[in-house]
């Protein structure tokens, strides 16, 4: 339907943005915006989070005419968003609105509007952002994944951005982690353990190689 077409148009726009994707939101929406920005940045789309309140005190300078802004507000009436919305409209920076209310201030001013489906918050009082934040996060993740596909982002690219932790180890190549034998302290089989103890600290690898007269590695 209309939302599917809008989603596709947003992906097209973000895939061709010349600068960065700027995520902004206040309160719980701000935390969701941060996570979406982090997911995009780690999957091939240059993205950052800008706090809407801080934006009014100088951080608007972080947003350039080459960027695109995704503004998140469940109600679409977050007062702290007013200055950043005015700024992007003034300089004709693309504004993508993520909101539950198409007829809200944010919904009316967005160049593209992604409307969350009707929902009731899981909070017993129907007040605390729960269902809305989960739906927004899912929508943001969907955008990030669609951009991955559009840009042809590969496992190798993913590995470049994730050098640490289990993911980094799984995607790293041996030649990226290995140290040449010339960098490792070595001893011969005839040397004493005292020599080994003295040699190990010089390489800072916590080990020592044992080599034969021809320099071939016999063991560690």
Regions found by a protein language model. Name each.
Residues 1, 68-73, 182-184:
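Short, basic, glycine/proline-bearing loop/turn elements
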Residues 1-15:
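An N-terminal, well-structured beta->alpha segment
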Residues 177, 200-203, 208-220:
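A glycine-centered beta-loop-beta connector
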Residues 6-10, 55-59, 195-196:
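Short acidic active-site motifs
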Residues 15, 20-26, 30-138, 144-147:
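Glycine-rich phosphate-binding loops that contact phosphosugars or nucleotide phosphates
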Residues 108, 122, 149-179:
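Internal, active-site/partner-interface "lid" segment
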Residues 187-204:
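The conserved cystathionine-beta-synthase
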């Amino acid at each position: 339907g209309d939302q599917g077409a809008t989603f596709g148009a947003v992906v097209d726009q973000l895939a061709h943005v010349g600068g960065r994707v700027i995520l902004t939101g206040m309160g719980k929406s701000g935390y969701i915006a941060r996570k979406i920005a982090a997911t995009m940045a780690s999957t091939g789309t240059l993205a950052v989070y800008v706090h809407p309140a801080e934006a009014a005190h100088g951080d608007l300078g972080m947003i350039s005419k080459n960027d695109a802004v995704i503004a998140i507000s469940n109600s679409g009436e977050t007062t702290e968003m007013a200055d950043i919305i005015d700024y992007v409209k003034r300089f004709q920076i693309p504004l993508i609105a993520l909101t539950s209310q198409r007829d809200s201030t944010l919904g009316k001013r967005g160049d593209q509007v992604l409307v969350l489906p009707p929902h009731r918050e899981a909070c017993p009082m129907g007040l605390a952002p729960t269902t809305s934040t989960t739906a927004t996060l899912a929508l943001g993740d969907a955008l990030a994944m669609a951009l991955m596909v559009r840009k042809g982002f590969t496992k190798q690219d993913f590995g470049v951005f994730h050098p640490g932790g289990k993911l980094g180890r799984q995607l790293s190549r041996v030649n990226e982690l290995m140290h040449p034998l010339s960098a490792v302290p070595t001893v011969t089989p005839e040397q004493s353990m005292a020599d080994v103890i003295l040699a190990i600290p010089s390489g800072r690898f916590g080990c020592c190689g044992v080599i034969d007269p021809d320099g071939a590695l016999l063991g560690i």
